[in-house]
Amino acid sequence: MAVWLPAQNKFYLPTQPITKILSSDDYVSRTNIFYHATSDRLLIVGHPLYEVTRANDNTMTVPKVSPNQYRVFRVRFPDPNRFAFGDKDIFDPETERLVWGLRGIEIGRGQPLGVGISGNPLLNRFDDAENPSRYNNTHATGDNRQNVAFDAKQTQMFLIGCTPATGEHWSIARRCAGTQFQLGDCPPIELVNTVIEDGDMFDIGLGAMDFGSLQANKADAPLDIAGTVCKYPDYIKMGQEVHGNSLFFFARREQMYLRHVFTHAGIVSEKEKVPTSAYIAAKAEQPQNTIATDNYFVAPSGSLVSSDVQIFNRPYWLQRSQGQNNGICWRNELFVTVADNTRGTTMNINVLNKATPETYDSADYNEYTRHVEEYELSFIVQLCKVKLTPENLAFLHNMDPTIIDSWQLTVSQPPANAIEDKYRFIESLATKCPDNVPPPTPTDPYKDLRFWDVDLSERMSEQLDQFPLGRKFLYQSGLAQRSVPKTVNFRKRRSSNTTVAKRRRRA
């Protein structure tokens, strides 16, 4: 008996074609000309926990310089199209434009290794949950804040790109319409992406979150991050960026272990209390009859700081970026995002506040704390060319129109056949509005963001062998080989006694 059955296999239609993003190697050609650029010694000094301001007008007197802050350097290179090259065949200004391509970088860090301290004299540290000596269930009342400090999670990282790096953190979200909530309910949270700016805090082991909007008591976090935002680089989003401008490559090393386990004081909401099915009730006379708080938190520690695991003070060579941009520095600038708290030493300074005392008294001295940081940036850049074809210009315009604007490309206008009218006092109310509005002045797309500007316009050199990073690049790439010293053989000098003996024999 024949029975008809429907086909069991499924048919898959081809996906819709997507716009192909070209690699920079497809429209950028490289020359054999390399330049070395290095910055000055970059120094910064400030208070490690907070910004010091003048009491009467809130004017900043000492900046906040924490070892747990990002340092974002905006490096500006000179425009290669304005260079006066001796060789006229390097490029044709009518059909080509010059750009820089990153080939090597070394981030130098000064100052000795040291462990930084992060703490709060009024930290919401209720009880020890690691080795408790008694059952404490009085977390819902009183002021139990204590003076607690710890060393943060150890972090070393840097990110290189021609646009600022993107960070992520958790912040308060908008409640849905029609949602019933009461005062004291936990707000919804969402993942937020923002630009990592100079001076932003990175994660110290307590999470990447907006502590200002999610911690109203200002006591659940150390002073340096209380009321601020801790950001973590969004490697996933930057890795999926279509043009690959924000992240050419990166290096990171993070480590942490749990030093102590504490609890926070405060009322545990009835909506999120420990379910009765998770425990067996205690007797009425037992203190365990009232459940203690389950609001645990850890005191992190970055552990040992060693020079064996340093990612700085060494060269990095760029052969192939992880994205489509293979190291081309559009708009002649580069963003170097650095996070390093392995040199987080807090300097303690004390000064006499009265005449020389006869006996020691703490009231005779004023105590101050400072933190210092030292950087030096070195680069090897390669001269590259972009042909001004319609395809290349259209692609670059879709990626970033300001790139073409900075090249000052002009289009020839057709000759005018008729006479034109030219008004005097065209800006006055007596005449018509002007027809041709002057082009707007180019604005900085990052004018509202904080960066450490490093201008290398006058610090470029073609003599690579005169600089440490340049010599390393020459030897690594094989562009120049140091000749091996010739071996010199010295004849062994005969002693005078042997020579006299031979003369006597001949005689």
Swiss-Prot record:
GO terms for MF: structural molecule activity
Which GO terms of the cellular component aspect does the record hold?
A: host cell nucleus; T=7 icosahedral viral capsid
Q: Could you list the residue ranges that cross the membrane?
A: none
> Mind telling me which Pfam families this protein's record contains?
Late_protein_L1
The entry's keywords: Capsid protein, Disulfide bond, Host nucleus, Host-virus interaction, Late protein, T=7 icosahedral capsid protein, Viral attachment to host cell, Viral penetration into host cytoplasm, Virion, Virus endocytosis by host, Virus entry into host cell
BP term (GO), one: endocytosis involved in viral entry into host cell
Note the InterPro entries from the entry.
Answer: Capsid_L1_Papillomavir (IPR002210), Capsid_L1_sf_Papillomavir (IPR036973), dsDNA_vir_gr_I_capsid (IPR011222)
Q: Where in the cell is it found?
A: Virion; Host nucleus
Using the UniProt record, give the first listed, main subcellular location.
virion
Q: Which family does it belong to?
A: Belongs to the papillomaviridae L1 protein family.
Job description of the protein: Forms an icosahedral capsid with a T=7 symmetry and a 50 nm diameter. The capsid is composed of 72 pentamers linked to each other by disulfide bonds and associated with L2 proteins. Binds to heparan sulfate proteoglycans on cell surface of basal layer keratinocytes to provide initial virion attachment. This binding mediates a conformational change in the virus capsid that facilitates efficient infection. The virion enters the host cell via endocytosis. During virus trafficking, L1 protein dissociates from the viral DNA and the genomic DNA is released to the host nucleus.
HAMAP family annotated for this entry? PPV_L1 (MF_04002)
Q: How does it assemble?
A: Self-assembles into homopentamers. The capsid has an icosahedral symmetry and consists of 72 capsomers, with each capsomer being a pentamer of L1. Interacts with the minor capsid protein L2; this interaction is necessary for viral genome encapsidation. Interacts with protein E2; this interaction enhances E2-dependent replication and transcription activation.
Protein name in the entry = Major capsid protein L1
Which source organism? Human papillomavirus type 63
